Amino acid sequence: MGQKINPIGLRLGINRTWDSRWYANTGEYGKLLHEDVKIREFLTEELKQAAISKIVIERPHKKCRVTIHSARPGIIIGKKGADIEKLRKKLSEMTNADTSLNIVEVRKPEIDATLIAQSIAQQLERRVAFRRAMKRAVQSAMRLGAEGIRINCSGRLGGAEIARMEWYREGRVPLHTLRADIDYGTAEAKTAYGICGVKVWVFKGEILEHDPMASERRAVEGDNQGSSSNRRRENA
């Protein structure tokens, strides 16, 4: 089962939490769910260059709070915050609610599964050899603290007549272990020969406590430790 299912969906409520966090009446649920899909599609299209990892949507009473996790927050914010204000106004019009927009920087894009998949897809579109792109991504992830990584590329790789699937793995990726903190991401490369799919699994260690927010808290703590160690180096 762990080999087939989306690893994030399998761990929801155990050591992962949902990206849409709100409750609704039966009559409103469908409308709000459709709104979430539209918000994500709009932001993904609008901020293609911003390296977006994930979009979290929360809905306090008659409000909407959107949190964008991005490796390039400067592109979203713009000069003196002009771009982020335009985005906020567009989102308010889409939701018909008072919308706030938060940006969270992804400090280690090399171990974020979605960003790795996007990077490989962009390289395939630029005709970089798929094996080289995969190997480079694996080496970067292992160097920056991942305990294991697996990458699948499928489609007409290198312009081959027959589509196939190639994969590369290093370290451990225990898909069946529920306490494993596994990040998963996908991307599509639109090449001259057709679409190639990229899937990435990153194993970041084990979470022993039963806490749906554990994975997020761990990422934030890791960022803080990284920034404090950088400050210590600068002071030295």
From Swiss-Prot:
Record bears the keyword Coiled coil: no
Keyword Disulfide bond recorded: no
CDD domains named in the record: KH-II_30S_S3
GO cellular component: cytosolic small ribosomal subunit
KH type-2 domain ranges (all copies): 39-107
Classification via InterPro entries: KH_dom, KH_dom-like_a/b, KH_dom_type_2, KH_sf_prok-type, Ribosomal_S3_C_sf, Ribosomal_uS3_bac-typ, Ribosomal_uS3_C, Ribosomal_uS3_CS
Swiss-Prot/TrEMBL keywords: Ribonucleoprotein, Ribosomal protein, RNA-binding, rRNA-binding
GO molecular function: mRNA binding; rRNA binding; structural constituent of ribosome
Chain intervals for the UniProt region annotation (Disordered): 214-236
Top-level taxon of origin: Bacteria
Record-level GO BP terms: translation
Subunit (UniProt): Part of the 30S ribosomal subunit. Forms a tight complex with proteins S10 and S14.
UniProt family annotation: Belongs to the universal ribosomal protein uS3 family.
Function: Binds the lower part of the 30S subunit head. Binds mRNA in the 70S ribosome, positioning it for translation.
The name this protein goes by in its record: Small ribosomal subunit protein uS3
Organism the protein comes from: Brucella anthropi (strain ATCC 49188 / DSM 6882 / CCUG 24695 / JCM 21032 / LMG 3331 / NBRC 15819 / NCTC 12168 / Alc 37)
Name of the coding gene: rpsC
